[in-house]
């Protein structure tokens, strides 16, 4: 009886080699694929970051894609003015010019979703006239007392351009457009040798139970906080401070058993609005232990420490950036730094460093 391998042994060895080769291929693919979860409370800027990725890494928006944003922008603009006018009633703030009452009725006659290739001229005129009214301006200054889109002032200031018959949204117009994210959306794009799969989930409370489906094999979490909302209340529950809600959510994510080994990149976002608000809306009114007054650097340090100190795991890395998600130049720079971090984390997770 010979000592050579039997046919069965040879087949077994070939199968083992095939499995090992497949595992190596899978590991190489895993090394080149980044699965990133975008988390954060509602309106923190997650969808804006995804739009920036398209601008920075996919050549931006085509003419047809820009055209498709027109109705969203028209609706955002009209609805924002409607919200202010309704707030004027509840706050008992009058129009400075009674003749603008005609324009108020024009706004209230508009449907929730504005359809068509152009904004009706009477609507553009109404928004322009109302935005110049000091009563509307006074109500806008008190917007922390009601729920108003961040993009309102931007679109109102640009209403003459937006109301043009040949209007085509700019990059900035698109970035500032707002559609509530429901469910889970996946965006894939390539940076160098890496394929990013970014998952955006609805930030409102009712959406959070759906996040669990995204949790497996996540390379990293990108968690966004709108730090400008330190003086605002939740859309879903007007007894809860938005910053407190963000802290609670970050605590649950950072210390979750699902993410024991997952690094977190924390974007403290909307720094432009934050800087504007500090002098007129004291942070100490909402966070009594804050002692930095209107000093921007002190306020940033305070918020940063409030979030980072929630991390209970010594081995978990939290990388922080102060961001303005609508600033493409800044986001390009920040995401380049994030890319370097992710490459290192991915190599570590794959056991290659």
From Swiss-Prot:
Source organism, top-level taxon: Eukaryota
Keyword Nucleotide-binding: yes
Pfam families noted in UniProt: G-alpha
Binding residues annotated for a divalent metal cation, in chain numbering: 47, 181
Region span, G2 motif: 173-181
GO CC annotation: cytoplasm; heterotrimeric G-protein complex
Effect of a null allele: Leads to a strong increase of dihydroxynaphthalene (DHN)-melanin production.
InterPro entries reported for this sequence: Fungi_Gprotein_alpha, Gprotein_alpha_su, GproteinA_insert, P-loop_NTPase
Region called G5 motif, residue ranges: 323-328
Keyword line: GTP-binding, Metal-binding, Nucleotide-binding, Transducer
Basic and acidic residues compositional bias, start-end: 7-25
One GO term of the biological process aspect: G protein-coupled receptor signaling pathway
Molecular function as annotated in GO: G protein-coupled receptor binding; G-protein beta/gamma-subunit complex binding; GTP binding; GTPase activity; metal ion binding
UniProt-annotated stretches for the region Disordered: 1-25
Cysteine pairs bridged by disulfides in the record: none
Function: G-protein complex alpha subunit that plays a role in conidiation and regulation of the biosynthesis of secondary metabolites such as dihydroxynaphthalene (DHN)-melanin, via interaction with the G protein-coupled receptor gprM.
Subunit record text: G proteins are composed of 3 units; alpha, beta and gamma. The alpha chain contains the guanine nucleotide binding site. Interacts with gprM.
Name of the protein described by the UniProt record: G-protein complex alpha subunit gpaA
């Amino acid at each position: 009886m010979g000592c050579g391998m039997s046919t069965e042994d040879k087949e077994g060895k070939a199968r083992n080699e095939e499995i090992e080769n497949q595992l190596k291929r899978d590991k190489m693919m895993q090394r080149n694929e980044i699965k990133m979860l975008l988390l954060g409370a509602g309106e923190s800027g997650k969808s804006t970051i995804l739009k920036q990725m398209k601008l920075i890494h996919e050549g931006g928006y085509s003419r047809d894609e820009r055209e498709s944003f027109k109705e969203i922008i028209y609706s955002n603009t009209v609805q924002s003015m409607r919200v202010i006018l309704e707030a004027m009633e509840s706050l008992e703030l009058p129009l400075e010019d009674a003749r603008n009452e005609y324009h108020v009725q024009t706004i209230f006659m508009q449907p929730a979703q504005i359809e068509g290739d152009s904004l009706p001229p009477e609507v553009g005129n109404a928004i322009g006239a109302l935005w110049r009214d000091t009563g509307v301006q006074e109500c806008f200054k008190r917007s922390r007392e009601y729920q108003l889109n961040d993009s309102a002032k931007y679109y109102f200031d640009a209403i003459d351009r937006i109301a043009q018959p040949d209007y085509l949204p700019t990059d900035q117009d698109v970035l500032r457009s707002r559609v509530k994210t429901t469910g889970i959306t996946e965006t894939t794009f390539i940076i160098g040798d890496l394929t990013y799969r970014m998952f955006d989930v609805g930030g409102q409370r009712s959406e959070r139970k759906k996040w669990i489906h995204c949790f497996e094999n996540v390379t990293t979490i990108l968690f966004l906080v709108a730090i400008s909302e330190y003086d605002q209340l939740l859309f879903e529950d007007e007894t809860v401070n938005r910053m407190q809600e963000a802290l609670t959510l970050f605590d649950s994510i950072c210390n979750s058993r699902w993410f024991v080994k997952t690094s977190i990149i924390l974007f403290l976002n909307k720094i432009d609005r934050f800087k504007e608000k500090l002098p007129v809306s004291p942070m100490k009114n909402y966070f009594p232990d804050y002692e930095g007054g209107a000093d921007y650097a002190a306020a940033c340090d305070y918020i940063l420490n409030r979030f980072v100190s929630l991390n209970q795991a010594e081995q978990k890395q939290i990388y922080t950036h102060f961001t303005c998600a609508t600033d493409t130049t800044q986001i390009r720079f920040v995401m380049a730094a994030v890319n370097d971090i992710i490459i290192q984390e991915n190599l570590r997770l794959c056991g290659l460093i």
